[in-house]
Amino acid sequence: MITNIGKEIVNTIIKDDPVRPHLDSDFRTSSHREVYALYEDKYAEQHFPDNDIKAVICVAYTNEVPKDEHELDLYSQQACQDGQRGNIAVFYTVWSYSKGAGREIVNTVAKQLHDDKRATRFVTLSPLTEMAEKFHLRNGAELLEKHNSCQNFEYTL
């Protein structure tokens, strides 16, 4: 079960983010940004909101592909000012608590956003690590570009 989680739950799990733990819950839940959690079953979220989470993904909506956190913030705010949601879903951090859950949440959220017509492109803002590169390439993404501090991958549906 995938659900968009609120700031209260985000506050309790930020410490587990291995990529961007410095981004607070206000950043993650404002300016057309959302945080999704993958739960063990459909009832876990109702009874144990911050327990039984298998994976987490943070998404920002932009109209341009960001090269770093500063551009991510700027582009999502600009998309928000237009009174519309950006058409690019940027997955800027993902982590999992169980094997295979990272892949599951990326693929499920991308499909859900695509089916709901909430985004037309699905890209990442990933760290320049071998682990991030292997994860995304192994899960069907293509490398778009490498920058000074980050790299972008794109998932197509």
Task: List each language-model region with its residue ranges.
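Conserved beta-strand-loop-alpha-helix junction that forms the acyl-donor binding cleft
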Residues: 96, 123-134, 147-157
